[in-house]
Amino acid sequence: TAPGAPAAVTAAPRAAAALPSPAASAAVGAPSAALPATTVRLPFASLGAFEPLRLRGADDARTINAGVRLDRVVTGARLRLTYAYSPSLVFPMSHLKVSVNGEVIATVPFDAAQAGRTVTQDIPIDPRYFSDFNQIGVRLIAHYTLDHCEDPANSALWADVSPTSELILDEAPVRLPNDLALLPAPFFDRRDNGLVRLPFVLPASADSATLRSAGVLASWFGALADYRHARFPVSSTLPSDDQAVVIGTAATLPAGLALPSVNGPLLAVADNPAAPGRKLLVVTGRTAAEVDDAVATLVLGRAALSGPAATVAHVDPGAPRKPYDAPRWLPVDRPIAFRELVSDPHALEVRGTAPDAIRLNLRVPADLHSWNGSGVPITLRYRYTAPTAQDNSTLAVEINDQLVKSYRLAPARAEDARGRLQLPLLSVPDGRVTSDVDIPAFRVGSGNQLQLRFTLDSQKTGLCSSTATEPQRAAVDPDSTIDFSHFVHYAQLPNLAYFANSGFPFTRFADLSQTAVVLPDRPTAQDLEAYLTMLGHMGEWTGFPALRVQLARAADVAALGGSKDLLVIDGASSSPLLAHWRAALPVAIGGPRGAGATRVAFSVDERWRNGVGRPDGGAHIEQSGPLATLAGFELPGSRGRSVVALTATEPGRLGELLDVFEKPGLVAQVQGDVAVVRAGTVDSLRVGEPYVVGFVPWYARVWTHAARHPVVLGAVGVVAGLLLALGAFSVLQRIAARRRGM
């Protein structure tokens, strides 16, 4: 905060009774005295504003979205606004206007003494303004001169709101009824943008069937969590301070649960006897098969659930999923219209001179391969407020914040002023500008964002010339398309970047029908947390529960016969399965040696570097201290089947490996076939032999090999041309001879 007294805040009149009352408490229950009130701090960065809110011009606004959980009610609120503003303003006429859900709650005047510095201001907010979903608006009203010739787009008109600004909410708990109709709340609440942490309560010695059912349920919660990510700590006892999921047969459930008689697959919401005010989601049945049916009913949404408990009938999970048909992935067999990429058509429209980019998320399979080097074609159709003369108005097309192409927007034509128009039908392209863009294939990964950034230059041409008060507008037509259909599915593995970003190759089938998860015979709580959390990530990446995942133990791997891709999770330093595969492993971790500090044997048998084989390379490293590794290799004895192993020197270190998947900066460092995690850092290596999966047509293989040798390709082209010419010459000679004979 800058020195000196902060500027005064002018607050709006106190909200009247007509303001929206807290929807959560009115709809589902009254505030609960069983749980203490809490204070929640929501930095703007956690609400999606990772960069400063840049307000430009005489009148510019930005909004931040914030939710209030269903089981909480706001009792007090304040906005801690951190901002800076131009020192060139006329301060009596310039200010920030703050609103909540469209209602102005305060104006923040600017002070000349604070200009150009960072200022922090606390703004009280009446809690009755808050509902389930809320928009916090900040609008800049700015002037730099008292002259009527002021340019509303002058560069002196600016203010920046820092992403460290906070919305601080005092919240009281709300007692929710035990009602299945509220699911997935309160175990997952879409109003909460934070990391989902949901404990699972499993029997002390859970069998494989129970663990498989728990994994399917975790993948469903992971799909719901999406970008928030989800962690699933495991215990055999009820948590004393949280909600939880309890899963198992009726005979293995914890004591003290208030449940009806179990006469079949049962879903129930009950109070947590160990934590007053908290809830339990109980998934049970008389047998493991009934537990599985209850899970399938819940994750598929095949039944309209209500009341505290419901006994469900057998559910058909449907046909197995086809390759590459994950709901969260784009279709790669046809062009995709932009309307399929947004939930609201208004997301394709912007207004103002320098609006935020139109952002379209594109998640595609990681093994898309462009055999001829061609890019991703986009047919882009857009409209905009045409400038009266050629200026600096542009449309920039970017992929993952990298510029692909920029278009200068053409000025208005003479016929645009005739005053007669026809409203275009959706199928009629008149009135739009169409451009074809080709995104380089090497810039497209499994998770991408396409950014369409309009810059609409000011129309002010002279010192005292007027401009339109209505801001410029631009829109991208929903029938613009992007097309991945000419790519083939082909990838060189192992590549842990594919796994860390999209779960490939396991997520090739959204229901994980070609995946087996291998756990130790006696898994620890950390092993099970890693198992459930990784299946949660699979659901996050695909948007579909892992209905057909198979759970196996080390002794079951041989019986699989190389028919599955394997995800191996073992936090012990001496895994018998990994020891059996030691010849194929790119990395081997030894356990503790001697007394005192842990001695870690880290063996790397380096066989590949920079595309060149090194059959005699190798290293053996010993160090003190724990670590965890992520390793990928081809399943020994199979053809194209993959193994990804999560291992550690001790079970507790698996948590550090799980932390990596929640931090984009660390995920970006996971590459190659070995990723070593220690002390919050990731070191990636490529040390093993590569193998390929997928299919490339014969003509593509010929072209790929030929393209590696351009001189040979040129010589072959010359020879082919000569042979073609000689053949044509011979044919023409025979034709001429026949004519002479006639």
Locate the predicted segments by residue:
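Solvent-exposed alpha-helical segments and adjacent loops
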Residues: 6-742
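N-terminal Sec signal peptide cleavage junction
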Residues: 1-3
